[in-house]
């Protein structure tokens, strides 16, 4: 339901008092019908629930993280994304129902929410137990040639040629110079199956042909790995504490139950109350998820 249609459903509103009618109240602030109209003009393609959620999030997260997410930070992020997309930026925004003018406030809300999530992770998730769990599967940086082929036959032929003799190995390394990469177990650019095989290799060793199917495209690739410089993590977990924290951070950012719990925490902290019955279930996806996870 989009803003224009939903606003008609607001109950008990005459033309004279509808603009000042409260939709959502919270500590020290409120969201009125007039605020929703204003937001709908800026984001005409966004569903009403999304508009109201973002209005609420912007207000409650600004209280705690407004000083962290500055206008300069937002502008820098917007520029970075714009540069990344180049000439496709406008069309990418259109697909999301955004314009260049509305993208900045949209990004600000996203960054405020991210700041709240990251704060909660830092305060509650970097425990000894979580660090030890991350440590179990962590492998530090290695450097290797990681070469992919589109068929198993091509990969097998390339591997056989590389392993045949020193000349074959030298030719393999010269041909695939751009495929020489440094990665660890947190890297997203190297498939998990390839990492698992690579971490078992000694310097100068080749892997067998490794099959990996992309979860995003469904395409299967066939990899060959030659280890250049392996590493051992040893027994000192503290040496890699920052890397392990990043493992935990990435995991929690992708955990929808955790993220919903963070949002629910701030909704409760700010006593956010939906006054208009048409939007009674506006935040249920966060509060119900939080309740179910805490009761387990």
PLM region descriptions:
Residues 1-53, 150-151, 164, 189-193, ...:
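Short, low-structural-confidence N-terminal segments
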């Amino acid at each position: 339901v989009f803003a224009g249609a939903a606003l008609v459903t607001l109950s008990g509103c005459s033309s004279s008092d509808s603009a000042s009618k409260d939709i959502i109240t919270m500590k020290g602030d409120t969201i009125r019908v007039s605020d929703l109209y204003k937001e709908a003009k800026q984001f005409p393609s966004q569903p009403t629930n999304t508009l109201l959620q973002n209005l609420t999030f912007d207000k409650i997260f600004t209280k705690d993280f407004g000083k962290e997410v500055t206008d300069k930070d937002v502008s820098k992020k917007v520029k970075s994304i714009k540069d990344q997309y180049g000439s496709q930026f406008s069309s990418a925004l259109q697909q999301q129902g955004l314009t260049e003018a509305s993208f900045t406030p949209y990004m600000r809300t996203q960054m405020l929410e991210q700041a709240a999530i990251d704060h909660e992770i830092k305060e509650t998730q970097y425990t000894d137990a979580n660090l030890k769990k991350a440590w179990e599967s962590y492998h530090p940086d290695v450097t290797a040639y990681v070469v992919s082929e589109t068929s198993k036959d091509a990969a097998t032929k390339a591997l056989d040629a590389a392993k045949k003799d020193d000349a074959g190995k030298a030719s393999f390394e010269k041909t695939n110079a751009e495929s020489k990469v440094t990665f660890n177990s947190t890297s997203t650019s190297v498939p998990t199956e390839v990492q698992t095989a690579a971490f078992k290799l000694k310097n100068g060793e080749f892997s067998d042909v490794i099959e990996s199917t992309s979860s995003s495209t469904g395409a299967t690739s066939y990899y060959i790995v030659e280890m250049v410089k392996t590493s051992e993590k040893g027994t000192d977990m503290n040496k890699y504490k920052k890397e392990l924290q990043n493992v935990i951070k990435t995991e929690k950012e992708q955990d929808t139950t955790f993220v919903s719990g963070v949002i629910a925490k701030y909704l409760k902290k700010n006593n956010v109350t939906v006054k208009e019955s048409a939007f009674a279930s506006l935040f249920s996806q966060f509060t119900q998820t939080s309740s179910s996870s805490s009761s387990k």
